[in-house]
Amino acid sequence: MINKKQSLTLLSAIALSVSLSACSVFDWLIYKPDIPQGNYMEPQQVEKLRIDMTKEQAEYILGRPVLRDSFADDTWYYVYHYKSGRDASITHKELILHFTGNKLSLVKGDYELSPEFNTPLEQSKLPMVNTTESAPQVPAQRPDEKPLVKENQTEAQVQKPIK
């Protein structure tokens, strides 16, 4: 038969095992933040890249790279690493720019380049912008000729003479 000391030991062992297993049962209740690291880039940004761009132009479009080779400044690394807090999925993307002199010569990585990448920026056509708005009109040219803003009196008109 089980005595009092054995039953107390058995009861404490059961309580300990139940309390430790509770940590894993309620794991889905614990908030885990998403962890983004590096350069997040939209595909539209990468599509703006053109061959023979200068380093300044590439940096203006993509931002500063995560890593520049300290011995050869002709290779720039843009790395994006994202770990989801909910399902622990990991997204990893890289974009590597190679420059010859000060001009962009090669792009490698996980992003798709524009079909116009091999057309230098000086030779590419700018998109047409259709504007339906007309140029601003001066009051004499507007149909109603009323001022758009109510004019206040100037300080000279408001001040009273000093006695």
Swiss-Prot record:
One GO CC term, this protein: Bam protein complex
Xref: Gene3D superfamilies: 3.30.1450.10
Residue segments, region Disordered: 122-163
Signal peptide range: 1-22
Residues linked to a lipid group, N-palmitoyl cysteine type: C23
Basic and acidic residues biased stretches: 142-153
S-diacylglycerol cysteine lipid modification positions: C23
Membrane topology: Lipid-anchor
GO molecular-function terms, A-Z: protein-macromolecule adaptor activity
Key words, A-Z: Cell outer membrane, Lipoprotein, Membrane, Palmitate, Signal
Presence of keyword Membrane: yes
Domain of life: Bacteria
PROSITE patterns documented for this protein: PROKAR_LIPOPROTEIN
Main localisation: membrane
Any Pfam family matching the protein: BamE
Subcellular location as annotated: Cell outer membrane
GO biological process, one term: Gram-negative-bacterium-type cell outer membrane assembly
Quaternary structure (record): Part of the Bam complex.
Similarity-based family: Belongs to the BamE family.
Role this protein plays: Part of the outer membrane protein assembly complex, which is involved in assembly and insertion of beta-barrel proteins into the outer membrane.
HAMAP family: OM_assembly_BamE
Name of the molecule in the record: Outer membrane protein assembly factor BamE
Organism from which the protein derives: Shewanella oneidensis (strain ATCC 700550 / JCM 31522 / CIP 106686 / LMG 19005 / NCIMB 14063 / MR-1)
